[in-house]
């Protein structure tokens, strides 16, 4: 059966296995004990007429992912296939192997400027030497991440506009590093220093830092402890504060030591306290 493939521009063309063979071969380069032909063979079973190029990419990813249980190195192959899809989304064009590094660095500068304009990133990020930072990106470090790592970053951490991600992994690490360096005297040097630390996975900041560093709501702390007063005003003021912290991924700890115990007298209402448990 002649399967038609729907391109991003809506045009239909006949499916040829050569393109997905090439994608699988690139994804498996330098990875031991994985077979690009097996990935392609299983992916072909999922094809159908008028399938989109994105759905073909997903079929390849799923095919590689299903093999991780038998051979863990398929996690790196699946990661590379997912990265290929991610790059297309970030670059907003096809990935050209000859100009890939240029596309990558260009996307970093463009995304910082675009996200500042959209009020998603702190305008002080424009004070950094963006061309210098783009040249400091070690693009090959994308290969350090396994499939689950890339998928988690894609689903939860990369900034999105109009439901499209705006950051490739090294751009993401650099954005986080810039946010951490924003008040440094040598902000460019410190950003590169932080970037080299976290992009090599020698240290990974906590989730709130990854979410919010460099953004217009730079809440970087993981956990907060708040003491609630034993009064209507204290309880609802505390709840409001906790909601604000939780909104930007802060972890919450409640000190309820001041709460009166079950059966204690409430002077204001001439009632009896139900204690802590019903309130919780």
Residue ranges and their predicted role:
Residues 1-280:
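Extended catalytic cores of very large enzyme megasubunits
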């Amino acid at each position: 059966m002649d399967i038609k493939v729907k391109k991003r521009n809506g045009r239909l063309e006949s499916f040829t296995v050569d393109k997905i063979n090439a994608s699988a071969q690139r994804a498996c380069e330098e990875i031991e004990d994985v077979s690009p032909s097996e990935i392609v063979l299983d992916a072909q079973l999922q094809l159908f007429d008028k399938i989109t190029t994105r759905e073909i990419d997903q079929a390849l990813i799923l095919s590689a992912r299903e093999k991780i249980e038998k051979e863990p190195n398929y996690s790196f192959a699946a990661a590379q296939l997912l990265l290929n899809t991610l790059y297309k989304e970030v670059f907003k064009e096809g990935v050209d192997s000859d100009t890939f590094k240029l596309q990558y660095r260009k996307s970093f500068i463009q995304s910082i400027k675009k996200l500042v304009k959209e009020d998603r990133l702190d305008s002080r990020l424009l004070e950094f030497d963006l061309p210098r930072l783009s040249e400091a990106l070690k693009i090959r470090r994308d290969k350090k991440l396994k499939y689950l790592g890339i998928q988690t970053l894609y689903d939860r951490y990369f900034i999105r506009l109009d439901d499209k991600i705006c950051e490739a992994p090294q751009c993401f690490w650099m954005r986080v590093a810039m946010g951490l360096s924003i008040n440094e005297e040598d902000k460019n040097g410190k950003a590169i220093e932080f970037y080299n630390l976290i992009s090599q996975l020698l240290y990974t900041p906590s989730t709130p830092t990854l979410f919010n560093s460099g953004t217009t709501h730079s809440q970087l702390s993981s956990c907060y402890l708040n003491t609630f007063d034993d009064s209507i005003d204290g309880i609802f003021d505390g709840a409001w504060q906790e909601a604000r912290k939780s909104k930007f991924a802060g972890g919450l700890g409640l000190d309820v030591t001041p709460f009166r115990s079950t059966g204690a007298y409430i002077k204001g209402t001439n009632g009896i306290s139900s204690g802590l448990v019903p309130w919780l």
